[in-house]
Amino acid sequence: MTETTPEVEVAVEAEVTYSESFVFERPIQTVGRRKEAVVRVRLVPGSGKFDLNGRSLEAYFPNKVHQQLIKAPLVTVDRLESYDIFALLHGGGPSGQAGALRLGIARALIVANPEDRPALKKAGFLTRDPRATERKKYGLKKARKAPQYSKR
């Protein structure tokens, strides 16, 4: 009662590795938000150039902390010299815009190379920071600051 099934040789196609620079036919576009800032990011294969509202990274963000914050996702996945970044930033201040740009870059890197997702997720670059300014309440001077209290 033993039946023999014919064994079929299956040719395995070469697996596609994403470690080489991922080629895409058009720019990757993503959006990053933080506080009141909204940033639209375009990721293009290139040499690591930043174009933020027509200015360089150093001109737009003179603060080295903000520059480091923005480059962090690219450094994490070791693609600092692989892509050019064109971004339109509006709303908020420097800190909010830097955070929004970081989120937009991280989201674009995932679209470009899905294998980078675990590293970026672990580093916390894919989480939208929900903190925003608390509204002022009536009867108070600011969001939580009460007027001076006098016992007598």
Swiss-Prot record:
Signal peptide: none annotated. Gene3D superfamilies: 3.30.230.10. Residues 128-137 have a biased composition (Basic and acidic residues). Keywords: Ribonucleoprotein, Ribosomal protein. Residues 121-152 are annotated as: Disordered. GO terms for molecular function: RNA binding; structural constituent of ribosome. The keyword Ribosomal protein applies. One of its GO terms (biological process) is translation. Belongs to the universal ribosomal protein uS9 family. This is Small ribosomal subunit protein uS9. It comes from Mycobacterium marinum (strain ATCC BAA-535 / M). The gene is rpsI.
